């Protein structure tokens, strides 16, 4: 991989990424900006908690009773949570949880992990084995009518998903493949085709995790085990890197009224600090997080 990489302390002007004053996280994941309410959502995976930081800076959280992988606002209100048993509806007013769409009920060792919604409100998320067995997971599309369509099988750890600014490409990381791939994407139907490598990431204990795409087509990839968030240009060349105190950088999402902030989640590790939620000014605006249409 060629290309000059600018190593950033984080927020620009020599400032490191700012850690936000929210509860420590065991395995923070899945930040998602809700433009309709000006709130940021994220999850703590193993404890099964969904977190929110609202427009006034007030924190709230909900326990869904099982491990979770990601959270998405719903167009009609409330949240959709990717969890161990499938897709759950979470009523943030009452805390009530309902299983809307079971996933891989015949594979009790599997669980949903990361995901994202496209501009049309279709949700893409994948599974992984709890013991991280290679090839045990799959990638799915959940439509607004709750139709679940398998797209890719033989996945190791299904992780970050994002789209190019013109919606014609979909980026996808399978952590155990040590790379981010790219598909041709049909925004009219949600079909994917032509999977091919976009960029290798990591090796050994360092793996690609969640990702986000900016308005210039740059792909920001979290490195589990690498203490870093790296931006790759549209050709797959690394050009910026942001360092974090935790080894396990897990995911990122653009947010703020101008989509000019980048929120980053991390996880704790043996002998290191607990996971947290960070924010930085990346010097570029991002693409929005879209709500689930169902």
Where do the language-model regions lie?
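A short beta-strand motif characteristic of beta-propeller blades
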Residues: 16-22, 57-63, 98-105, 146-153, ...
């Amino acid at each position: 991989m060629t290309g000059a990489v600018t190593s950033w302390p984080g927020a620009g002007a020599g400032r490191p990424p700012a850690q936000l004053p929210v509860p420590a996280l065991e395995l923070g994941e899945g930040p998602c900006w809700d433009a309709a309410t000006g709130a940021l959502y994220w999850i703590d995976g193993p404890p099964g908690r969904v977190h929110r930081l609202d427009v006034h800076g007030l924190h709230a959280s909900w326990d869904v009773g099982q491990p979770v992988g990601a959270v998405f606002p719903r167009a009609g209100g409330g949240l959709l949570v990717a969890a161990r048993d499938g897709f759950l509806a979470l009523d943030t007013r009452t805390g009530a949880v309902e299983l809307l769409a079971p996933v891989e009920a015949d594979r009790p060792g599997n669980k949903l992990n990361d995901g994202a919604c496209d501009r049309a409100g279709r949700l893409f998320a994948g599974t992984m084995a709890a013991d991280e067995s290679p090839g045990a997971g799959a990638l799915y599309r959940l439509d607004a009518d709750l139709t679940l369509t398998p797209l890719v099988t033989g996945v190791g750890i299904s992780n970050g998903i994002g789209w190019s600014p013109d919606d014609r490409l979909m980026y996808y990381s399978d952590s155990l493949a040590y790379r981010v791939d790219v598909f041709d994407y049909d925004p009219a139907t949600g079909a994917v085709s032509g999977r091919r490598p976009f960029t290798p990431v990591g090796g050994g204990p360092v793996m690609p995790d969640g990702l986000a795409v900016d308005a210039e087509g740059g792909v920001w990839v979290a490195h589990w085990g690498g203490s870093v968030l790296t931006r790759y240009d549209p050709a797959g060349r690394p050009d910026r890197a942001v360092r974090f105190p935790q080894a396990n950088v897990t995911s990122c999402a653009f947010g703020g009224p101008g989509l000019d902030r980048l929120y980053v989640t991390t996880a704790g590790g043996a002998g290191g600090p607990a996971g947290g939620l960070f924010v930085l000014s990346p010097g570029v605006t991002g693409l929005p997080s879209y709500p689930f249409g169902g």
